[in-house]
Amino acid sequence: MSLMQMDSLLSLPTAELVSIADKTRRELVPPKLELCGIINAKSGLCSEDCKFCAQSSRHKAEISTYSLKDKAEIVRAAQIAKETGAERLGIVTSGNRLTEQELDVLAQATQEINDKVGIAVCGSLGALTKNELGILKDAGLSRYHHNIETSPRFYSQIVSTHSFQQRIDTIDSAKAVGMEVCSGGIIGMGETWQDRIAMANVLKELDVDSVPINFLIPIQGTAMASLETISCNDAIRTIALFRIILGHKTIRLAAGRESVLKDFQGMAFMAGANGMMIGGYLTVGGRLVEEDHRLVKEINSLWTE
């Protein structure tokens, strides 16, 4: 889609933009809302300086910090995620790399989840090498999560300890070993609309399978604590633009959906979203699972009418 076409879309009233996005979803995406859950398997003490993240050791956010959970805890989290209706469990660890021992524990946990729980396993484990990713792929890790976070232009404004290209390199490595890829980012960090469009276009070029959209939750102690959350209207328009640009890809609502969208979460699924994270996030909680189940039932019913 050309820049002129994108500018034309940006000028549309929200209702018209949402209508185009919903038509795109109905034509290209199966009418079923996808659910996933995560486990924060290793928390805090990260050496990276991502301005938005409470887990960076360079910030003063008050969070729980702990080393990698054992295999049994991770497998149990997969069972709980399955019981809440999630089709996937994302195992998430803080930090940019894994030790050899951590990699071994995660490979064993992944294999046991596949063998005994029966839920798809994803990993968000940092900038792993192709060899490390191959080990996890052989253990049954089906999808790798590695957000690009924002546009290439804006990336250096939020992180200085690694580059945008390094994110791309890890995604390419995951694809090279045969994994699916989940990659998106955070909206509301001070980026422009053109940055959001550029981010969506990069994800389209990378041909990722799933795109999580987070909305910044300004956490005390982080470098972005003083930022205001974006408006519900801007959030809805962003979701719609991503659907129009990304076509048939899964667009998954993640952190911040409750605080930004509030009572309008249902509208996000009329604006192009077709998936969401359930059961809480890394350092902040989510809605009650029962409330999300009611929303899922209503959306699935509406989509199949």
Predicted features, each with a name:
Residues R58-A77, A81-I171, M179-G184, D209-N214, ...:
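Core AdoMet radical
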Residues M1-F52:
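Flexible, acidic/Gly-rich N-terminal and inter-domain linker regions that tether
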Residues I74-A77, V105-I113, E132, Q166-S173, ...:
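A general structural detector for well-ordered alpha-helical segments in enzyme core domains, enriched
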Residues G95-T99, T170-Q194, I213-E228, K249-V260:
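Conserved strand-turn element in the central/C-terminal portion of the radical SAM core barrel
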Residues T129-D138, M189-K204, S259-A271:
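Catalytic cores of alpha/beta
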Residues A21, C50, I91, H146, ...:
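Conserved, mostly hydrophobic/aromatic
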Residues M1-A15, V75, K204-E305:
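Auxiliary Fe-S-binding modules of radical SAM enzymes
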